[in-house]
Amino acid sequence: MVRDTRNVDLEWGLELCKPEKVNKQNLFTNIIKPQKDKINIKTDKIKFFLDNLFTEFSKFHDSCYPDGRISTRSKLRWPLLIIWCILIVFAIDKNFEVKDFLSIWINESFINENRFYSEIWGPIAIYICLFVLLLLGLIYCSKIVVKAIPLISIVIAAVVVIIAVAMVKILYICHWLIYKILILAFGIKVKPLGDTLPTHNGETGSHSKATVGSDIEQIEFQNMPTPVKK
């Protein structure tokens, strides 16, 4: 008797999915942990790649420009940019195997024909395409940054003005609300402040403009030293 084995894997998988058959430790060890390890390996690989890339470029840049800056009028700025793009292309290929992956795809596309073309000129074309795309991307990004600088300054100034106006408006509204609450809710009448000067008793009181001079003279008379009798 021949057994139908087409649904064996499905039945076995359904059997393992039953609650009594699920082992959380095995699930973590066999499924979750390997995926987590793969993600960590890729993350570490990217960090290592970026560290090496910027280290090598810093060495190259310091050897060409000891002062630490690239002049916009320097004739070597474009060769430096081209060499920098080439370094990035080779670093990307070395760390992420772009050429090997695309070469496999090209070889599969040209099976039994143009084998020499796919093995020799395929990687060269890949490198050229990567280099051109990277160079165009850098040039385009630099143009966007240069054009965006005035716009960014205008936006920042507008935001600052809006924030200042909003703060003044909020303070005014808060003052108005407090004033209305004191008058309407508590019945407090706010009197306008007059000129207040200390009286001869040491207290403060409201004075009119006519009595201000006499009060000042009285205060000066009180502060005069008393004569000493011999």
Curated annotation (Swiss-Prot):
Location(s) in or outside the cell: Membrane
Main localisation: membrane
Membrane topology of this protein: Multi-pass membrane protein
Domain of life, source organism: Eukaryota
Pfam families reported for this sequence: DUF999
Residue ranges the record marks as coiled coil: none
Annotated TM spans: 78-98, 120-140, 148-168
InterPro entries, per database record: DUF999
Keyword Transmembrane helix appears in the UniProt entry: yes
This protein's UniProt keywords: Membrane, Transmembrane, Transmembrane helix
Keyword Oxidoreductase: no
GO cellular component term, pick one: membrane
First and last residue of the signal peptide: none
Family per similarity comment: Belongs to the UPF0494 family.
Protein name per the record: UPF0494 membrane protein PB2B2.14c
Organism in which the protein naturally occurs: Schizosaccharomyces pombe (strain 972 / ATCC 24843) (Fission yeast)
